[in-house]
Amino acid sequence: MRPIMLMGHERSLTQVKYNREGDLIFTSGKDNVASVWYAMNGERLGTLEGHNGSIWSIDVDQHTEYAVTGSADFSVKVWRVRDGSIAHSWDTRTPVRRVEFSPTGDRVLAVLDNVMNYAGAIVVFSVTRDANNQITGFNSGLSCEILTQEGCAPVLVASWSYDGKYIVAGHQDGKISKYNGVTGECLEIKDLHKQRVSDIQFSLDRTYFLTTSRDSYANLVDVETFEVLKTYETDCPLNSGCITPLKEFVILGGGQDARDVTTTSAREGKFEAKFYHKLFQVEIGRVDDHFGPVNYIAVSPQGTSYASGGEDGFVRLHHFDKSYFDFKFDVEKSADAQKKVDTADR
């Protein structure tokens, strides 16, 4: 896979997101401008300008009508994708570490940082939409506020499950927690990692999710039972991971801490995207093209490409080639052959 390099950020990347159709990529970084790109050729479509601090997170709704960003300037902003204008801005008590539209598009989740004697929280804002999915109203107050639970470290990342039924959060002490998506009631807390949870990304149907951690492990977890389905062990701290559609793979990225990068070579730093088989839990390949840690990895909903954002300030866009789709273990080839035999017998 030969990558397309997207150059539009002056500082490190913080998040990369595809829209539902997979034709646009939204990126945010530690500079104060977010970017929108064509996923086919990497051409920049436009920028979202209006923040006064680092943009820690970005998301786009299911209809690609609106994008949302969370920033270190104590604000959450909603943008009109068609022209890059600001539709609304909510002020927050502390910097915003993660934002995400609910699957239904009527709520926005934001993770607030634990600074200035504030313990941190997950807050939910609600919006009103018409029949054409246009937002007609923004509620100024909070729809829900989930404070840091007693006995837990602050939340770093959070995401919605299917239909917005649950909010799943990852904590600084390695725990994960599950909350009622409407009331904010804490439903379950689980000790999962030995170090902070760096990312949570759901499957396409949002029934299970992948956690990554700086303890070099990633876990596949069922959202209903909260049971660990699979565990992936790597040789470096992880910053992000995603679940691929079409193929039964997960992609993991990370590397040595950015502050230690100058003391080692790129090869020793493990600045790679690692491909693991989702079911067999074994590594099947690596892509090494960043000059620093991989901060975020996202795969297109169609499963035909993935994008990675790095500490080096670049986004690498990879379109999967034929060998990716053709790859199968012997047991998978045998199963496919048996299916053909069974079909022929009928």
Swiss-Prot record:
User: What PROSITE patterns does the database record attribute to this sequence?
Assistant: WD_REPEATS_2 (PS50082), WD_REPEATS_REGION (PS50294)
Compartments, record wording: Cytoplasm
Task: Give residue ranges of the WD repeats.
Answer: 8-47, 50-89, 150-189, 192-233, 289-328
Q: Which SUPFAM superfamilies does its entry note?
A: WD40 repeat-like (SSF50978)
Per the record's keyword annotation, is Membrane included, yes or no?
no
GO MF annotation: an example: translation initiation factor activity
- Listed Pfam families: EIF3I (PF24805)
Record flagged with keyword 4Fe-4S:
no
GO process annotations (BP):
cytoplasmic translational initiation; formation of cytoplasmic translation initiation complex
Disulfide linkage: none
What keyword terms does UniProt attach to this protein? Cytoplasm, Initiation factor, Protein biosynthesis, Repeat, WD repeat
Cellular component (GO) terms are: eukaryotic 43S preinitiation complex; eukaryotic 48S preinitiation complex; eukaryotic translation initiation factor 3 complex, eIF3e; eukaryotic translation initiation factor 3 complex, eIF3m; nuclear periphery
Its domain of life reads Eukaryota
Subcellular location, principal: cytoplasm
State the function annotated in the UniProt record: Component of the eukaryotic translation initiation factor 3 (eIF-3) complex, which is involved in protein synthesis of a specialized repertoire of mRNAs and, together with other initiation factors, stimulates binding of mRNA and methionyl-tRNAi to the 40S ribosome. The eIF-3 complex specifically targets and initiates translation of a subset of mRNAs involved in cell proliferation.
PANTHER family, from UniProt?
A: EUKARYOTIC TRANSLATION INITIATION FACTOR 3 SUBUNIT I
Protein family: Belongs to the eIF-3 subunit I family.
Q: Quaternary structure per UniProt?
A: Component of the eukaryotic translation initiation factor 3 (eIF-3) complex.
Write down what this protein is called: Eukaryotic translation initiation factor 3 subunit I
